[in-house]
Curated annotation (Swiss-Prot):
Pfam families: SelO. This is Protein adenylyltransferase SelO, mitochondrial. One of its GO terms (cellular component) is chromosome. The active site is at residue 341. The modification Phosphothreonine is found at residue 635. InterPro entries: SelO. The keyword Nucleotide-binding applies. The modification Phosphoserine is found at residue 651. Its main location: mitochondrion.
């Protein structure tokens, strides 16, 4: 269990948001319905979990509507409450897909592949049985989706189970995602399917081991129950298996939790369900700050009002969010659905849907095929997060004056993002001794070179980790570096026109004949981008593979010379250059992951799981627990062979067919 202990230690360094279970109270004594009081199977492996459901004690919970038990899930507005009671809907023959040992270790659990453990996990983590002390509920929140206020949203497919207090003094909220309908399910069924659940399960854990603040995933349980899904929204629905993910975090409260008080929006006309309930906003703020920002609460106990406390809270949320998105940019992570309801109030990556990691570097990469306007491209993520913080600032008024919040946002976000981003990029480039003003320009030119050559984001940084600081083997290194650039076939596929030529021609004619109408339609950006694609495609058609290779080498030789010049400045005054080089390489390898959850890796695991084979999910999970591991660390012929196999299977550039993979909001 050494790896588990190490993971627990690492988690303490990454998640700064963990509230302590000080003065542990008995589980909530709130009245429980007949179904909650009914006899449940007795857990054995999970028997030691102690629940203390503070959120339900300290925040308003909706009084269940009169009627039968199944009326708990009747879709309805939920005014004057932060939670509604819920009940997981049973699944037919639940079966464990995988457990995450490091995530479950947070709860004091030792995971294993013993049949009894897997059976118990499948029973309780599917929602088919409830652990003693759990109080299932659904959280009420609103959100701005793709820039427009959508009104009440809430946990339509997720359920709060309760909060586990551990022997280490930590408190963790447990949540089942995909456990069935709630009052917030609207017209949906409250279920998630196998493909989307595997993606969330694997990416939650992958992000943690990359060192990025994130919610965790302890288990993935599938079943023989099915639901209909139209994966690509093309009129071809199919049945898919219902699956549940056990999610773990200090809290799942989000920016949108504070938007339930929003008056009717001037654009959409929608309002939050608790307009005018300033008392609940105060209650929610008090709960969040005292529970998850206790140092801020303690620093402002003598204040005559809470404005300075709330300002300090907003400042910290702003800084955490800036650092989080900076970390995303440094590993090429694209979230895909950065709505305000998908932004954690404690600065964690939350709600993994149509996410993706960059393969070929493209600043305009759209990982979510449902994002037709490209609102959430890779390069726009920092500014979208800042926009979401602006909406949080508006939601906190009058408890925090908007002018003060906006001043904090203007002062903190861009500065903190740039500081953290450049600090991380310096480590990725092995610039460990001195900081130079031109480092930002060097990074920008690196990304420009990667874009011009279609370089693989993850693998390019890995190759740079072995860059010779002297002039030895420079030709061999350049060959290895350019081998990570996209082939001519890949580029032609990537830049193929996406708009029917006749439609494009009509749009161009409209732009000439009636520019006002063309502007009103709002397709100018799309047409401009399509023209750029057509032009790029035309240039590619005139290139030969050897021409492309020569251009790539020229681009990289130019940047590598600047990089070498910067390294020369880095080692000025160094006495032991060998020790400096060794430390530089060590830092680079510790900050440039070899393995990320590429879409094609996830897809292969999903396809195997859909055929009843969960071994690939478990294999990928173990691989992602050591993303910075390199084959140089392997010892012995068997270990080296295994490492080499993993290298070729999981760290190569994606196959050509991976470019056709399409991920949407369908889940």
């Amino acid at each position: 269990m050494a790896s588990v202990r190490a993971a627990v230690g690492a988690s303490l360094a990454v998640a700064r948001t963990r509230p302590r279970c000080v003065g542990l109270a008995l589980p909530s004594s709130a009245p429980r319905s007949a179904w909650a009081a009914a006899m449940e199977p007795t857990p054995r492996w999970l028997a030691g979990l102690r629940f203390d459901n503070r959120a339900l004690r300290e925040l308003p919970v909706e009084t269940p509507p009169p009627g039968p038990e199944d009326s708990l899930a009747t879709p309805r507005p939920v005014p004057g409450a932060c939670f509604s009671r819920a009940r997981p809907a049973p699944l037919r023959r639940p079966r464990l897909v995988a457990l995450s040992e490091p995530a479950l270790a947070l709860l004091g659990l030792e995971a294993s592949e013993e049949a009894e453990v897997e059976a118990e996990a499948a029973l309780f983590f599917s929602g088919n049985a409830l652990l003693p002390g759990t109080e299932p509920a659904a959280h009420c929140y609103c959100g701005h989706q793709f820039g427009q206020f959508a009104g009440q949203l809430g946990d339509g497919a997720a359920m709060y189970l309760g909060e586990v207090c551990t022997a280490a003094g930590e408190r963790w909220e447990l949540q089942l995602k995909g456990a069935g309908p709630t009052p917030f399910s609207r017209q949906a069924d409250g279920r998630k399917v196998l493909r989307s659940s595997i993606r969330e399960f694997l990416c939650s854990e992958a992000m943690f081991h990359l060192g990025i603040p994130t919610t965790r995933a302890g288990a993935c349980v599938t079943s023989e129950s099915t639901v209909m899904r139209d994966v690509f929204y093309d009129g071809n629905p199919k049945y898919e298996k219902c699956t549940v993910v056990l999610r773990i975090a200090p809290t799942f409260i989000r920016f949108g939790s504070f938007e339930i008080f929003k008056p009717p929006d001037e654009h959409t006309g929608r309002a939050g369900p608790s307009v005018g309930r300033d008392d609940i906003r105060v209650q929610l703020l008090d709960y969040v700050i005292s529970s998850f920002y206790p140092e801020i609460q303690a620093a402002h106990t003598c204040d005559t009002d809470n404005i300075q406390r709330n300002a300090a809270f907003f400042r910290e949320v702003t800084q955490r969010t800036a650092r989080m998105v900076a970390e995303w940019q440094c590993v090429g992570f694209c979230h895909g659905v950065l709505n305000t309801d998908n932004m954690s109030i404690v600065g964690l990556t939350i709600d993994y849907g149509p996410f993706g990691f960059l393969d070929r570097y493209d600043p305009d990469h759209i990982c979510n095929a449902s994002d037709n306007a490209g609102r959430y491209t890779y390069s726009k993520q920092p500014q979208v997060c800042k926009w979401n913080l602006q909406k949080l600032a508006e939601a906190l008024e009058p408890e925090l004056p908007l002018a003060l919040a906006e001043a904090i946002l203007k002062e903190e976000f861009d500065t903190e993002f740039q500081r953290h981003y450049l600090q991380k990029m310096r480590k990725k480039l092995g610039l460990i001794r001195v900081e130079k003003e031109e480092d930002g320009t060097l990074v920008a030119k690196l990304l420009e070179t990667m874009h011009l050559t279609g370089a693989d984001f993850t693998n390019t940084f890995c190759v740079l980790s072995s860059f010779p600081a002297d002039l030895s083997d420079s030709a061999e290194f350049l060959s290895r570096l350019t081998s990570q650039c996209a082939s001519l076939e890949e580029l032609r596929l990537a830049f193929r026109p996406q708009m029917d030529p006749r439609q494009l021609s009509m749009m161009l004619m409209l732009a000439q004949s009636n520019p006002q109408l063309f502007a009103l339609i709002g397709t100018q950006a799309n047409v401009t981008k399509e023209l750029e694609r057509v032009e790029h495609q035309s240039r590619l058609e005139q290139l030969s593979p050897s021409d492309l290779q020569r251009k790539n080498r020229d681009h990289w030789e130019a940047w590598l010379q600047e990089y070498r010049d910067r390294l020369d400045k880095e080692k000025e005054g160094v006495g032991d250059t060998a020790a400096w080089q060794a430390e530089r390489v060590r830092v680079m390898r510790a900050n440039n992951p070899k393995y990320v959850l590429r879409n094609y890796i996830a897809q292969k695991a999903i396809e195997a799981a859909e055929n009843g084979d969960f071994s690939e999910v478990r294999r990928v999970l173990k691989l992602l627990e050591s993303p910075y591991h390199s084959e140089e660390e392997a010892t012995g012929p068997e270990a080296v062979a295994r490492s080499t196999e993993e290298q070729s299977s999981y760290s190569n550039r994606p196959p050509l067919w991976a470019a056709e993979l399409c991920v949407t909001u369908s889940s």
